Amino acid sequence: MKKKYNISIVGQSNTGKSTLINYLCDKYVSAESKKLQTTRVNLYNSVSLNGMEINFIDTPGVSLQNNDLLSTSMKNAYIKTLESIDLLLLMIDIDNIDLKYEDSILDLANVAKTNVAMLINKIDLAEDDLSELEVLKSRISENYSLELYFMSLKSKQGVTQMVNGICKILETKPPLNNKNIIPVNQKIISMQEIIRGVIIELTHGDVPYDTAVHIETHVTKKKIIEINANIYVNKDNQKKIIIGKSGSMIKKIGIESRLKLELIHGKQFYISLKVLVKENWKNNYILLKEIGYID
């Protein structure tokens, strides 16, 4: 019987967390974007590596500045996750290093006595100045006692070494929690996040960050999955943007969402989308709980 381990991937937005998940799972399972707040809830994906079953948890890129209820729930996800994982992977973008942020995460990990490995991504951006990598390596080694991996998900440089390294870390101790920690509504939440990921890519300004998706109903049949979902926005003008001229944008969102979901689930999808204005929804406890942003 394979040992089951739980690994959480954390880091600021746009460090490559979702890209790493998709690479390890060898398929598209998590929305990727250069924009902030691509991931708002923990997303779970299992994969077999080196004879072990590893459950990767893609966590939100938390904004430490925002104080709305949504941001608070995202921050709380960090703390709750730390209580049930075997290893924390802290991802850093080599082109955007702010160790003050990392310090706050490492402090939480230290309190929870969680093993940590630091992944420095996008080293291809520093290929012309290798001395920069050595300086960074020395700087981190002087301040932190943890495993350190330099890699590039774009060029795949250092990725194999990183995977082998984290597996060796896990092999040194038995799993902390061999039980299934994946929420029962994870499938629905992941569908919602895929649709929201499409909206993020197709819209601009404040629209991507003021949008939430909630699947009201879903019916799974033999060959097709039917879902009816609401898209929530803060303002009337945002609703107009989501719908688009003569419904062009909402149609495009539906088509691209359907294609991504069919690729992931291997079934046909029928998607019905409705756009609703819900002012200040980020502080609406009931709605956030219905969507799955709050347990």
Which role does the model predict for each range below?
Residues 16, 158, 249:
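Conserved glycine(s) of the Walker
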